[in-house]
C-alpha cells in the first residue's frame, strides 16, 4: 500500500496483518481523489479532514499529501490505531494529524474541536455504521456548512442518505461504492 499522489507520492504505508481492517485499494483511492479534484473544485487544498473508521489512515494521509492542512483520524480498534501511528510517524505527519480513539458512529459533541470541511467514512461493510456516523457528525457539530463527505461502502449495502445531507453522486468500482454527499445544514 502506498500514497498515490501529492508530495508523498510513492511512499509506502504499513498494511494490516488481519482481515479486520480493509484499507481502500491504491487504484480506488487514486480514482476517488481524481474525482474530488476535477469534479468538485479541489476541496482538499487547505482542508480540515476527518477520516472516520480510519484503519490505516490511507484516505486522510492521501489528503495531507495533496495539500490538506490537517487530518483527524478516528478509529476505536487497537490494531488500527497502531497502524495509524506507525504511518503518521513514518511519513513525518505528526504536526498536521491527530489520532483519536472513539466510536465513529457515536462521536458526541465536537467542541472544542474545530469543524471539518472534508470527511471520509470507510466503515466495515454492510453494518449500517455509515448512516449512524453521519447522524453523529450532523448532530455533534463536526461539519462546516457545505462540508463534502465521502462514504465508502459495499455496493450491495443499499446505503441510505440521512437527513441533513444531499447526495451528489455515486460511483461503483467492482463491489465498492463511493457516495459523495454535501452537508446541507450548518452543524
Indicate residue ranges for each PLM-predicted region.
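Class I S-adenosyl-L-methionine-dependent methyltransferase catalytic core
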Residues: 1-187
